[in-house]
C-alpha cells in the first residue's frame, strides 16, 4: 500500500488489488461485505499512524475511487463539522459505539459501487485526464467526436487536468469507450478525483472547457 501526503490536511492511500489479496481481502469483500470493508479501512488507518504524522482526530472527509488496478482513498480533515455531499464526518478520537456506526455508514456509502441502473437520466460518469504539455490539450480541443462531453480545465501542481463528464442521456457504454480512446491519445488518465481538483486546483476554463480552448488557441 502506498501512502502520500497531499497537504497538511489530506492523505491519499493507494492499495492495489494484489495487495488486497495479500492482506486476505478480495474485491468482492471490499465492495459488498460491510465488515470486510470496515476492517480494511481500520487497517489503513492503523498503518497511517506509523507512516505519517497525521492525527485522524475530529471530522474527516473520505472519498474512495476504484481504479483499474486498485483502490484510491482520500482522507481529509474537515474544516467544518457536519455531513456534506462528498463525504461523511467521522470522529476517531474515541472509538465508541456512535463512531463505529458512523464508520459503517461511511463505508457502506463510499465502498459500494453505484449500479448503472440506479443512475438517473441526468447523472454523469467522470474521467480525469492529465496533460504535461498544454499543446496536447489544444490538439485535443480540435478532435472530433467529443462535442457532447462536459469538460472543465484545472491547473494543479504545475500540470493541467481536464475533468470530463459523460452525460448518461447522451453516452452509452460503447460511446464512452470510444470517447475515452480519443482522450487517451492526447493525455494520461489521472489518479486525482474531481473532488480533489475542485478543492485544491485552480480553474482555468469552466464548462465548456474544450470549446473555450479551441476558441482562444
Curated annotation (Swiss-Prot):
Q: Which GO terms describe its molecular function?
A: protein-macromolecule adaptor activity
Sequence similarity: Belongs to the MecA family.
What is the protein's name according to its record?
A: Adapter protein MecA
* Functional note: Enables the recognition and targeting of unfolded and aggregated proteins to the ClpC protease or to other proteins involved in proteolysis.
Q: What is known of its domains?
A: The N-terminal domain probably binds unfolded/aggregated proteins; the C-terminal domain interacts with ClpC.
Source species, domain of life = Bacteria
Q: What quaternary arrangement does the UniProt entry report?
A: Homodimer.
Query: Origin organism of this chain?
Result: Listeria innocua serovar 6a (strain ATCC BAA-680 / CLIP 11262)
Under the heading PANTHER family, the entry gives: ADAPTER PROTEIN MECA, ADAPTER PROTEIN MECA 1
Q: Extract the InterPro entries matched here.
A: MecA_C_sf, Neg-reg_MecA
